[in-house]
Amino acid sequence: MTIEQVVDGLPVSESQYYKVSKGASAFRRQEHLVLVLERLGVTDEDDVGFLVDIHRDGLSRGWWSTYSRTMPSGMAFYVGLEDGAKAMRCWTPTYVLGLLQTEEYMRAQFAAAKPVDETTTESIERGVEVRMQRKRILTRDNPLELRVILSEASLRNVVGSPAVMRKQYEEIIRLAELNNLTIQILPAKHETYRCAYDFNLMEFGESLPTVVQMDTVDGGSNVTDKDTEIWRFSRRYDVLRDGALPVGRTPKFLNDLVREI
């Protein structure tokens, strides 16, 4: 269904729907979301209620609303989706995935970008607070089912200092012991496919569509549930997974890095 077909006859503009579908904005009125969902064929009461809750949280009610003014474009909406997801599949080629990061790693990563992003020390601390809050979905009741593929480069790129990296390796080893986490590593020496940018596939249950999130150049977030994009990124994830080390070899790989750095 095209954008024109979705909004035809609805009190929603094409540009507004486009921004919402990309995760860069949100409908200001709940009834507009419900109308769009009906047009898209989402009518199950539980499904609609779930999406309305996420939408409302993205606007004001979620814990992240306290930080929304300091978040990049679309990030508050993404955090709302992440908080409501049942499962995620992630690939990171450059940095350790945010949900796996230690507080020290987060702070060092934000600080390194300070001259480029022209951020303040206060905004860095708020960014760290947000990421630490987001990590709670890994250990909450009914925790997120997280499957991650980390490139070796993301683990060898030194963020902060060797001491920060050692603690980060140990944190990943600890998290890998959780039943709801599956962490694989793609070694540099493996002759296989690599995606140049990170992405996250988010699943909400059988009756709701999977969405894929990609970071934008300005630090924002782009989200889509287009079938063609979900197929493309699912295929990429599957190929990356097949090229990575088996899950059981993750602790040894990381322990070797602890000794080497």
Regions found by a protein language model. Name each.
Residues 16, 30-34, 211-216:
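Short acidic (Asp/Glu) and glycine-rich catalytic loops that position anionic groups and cofactors
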Residues 3-9, 22, 26-156, 225, ...:
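Interdomain hinge/linker segments and adjacent boundary elements that couple functional modules
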Residues 1, 12, 181:
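Short glycine/serine/threonine/alanine-rich loop segments
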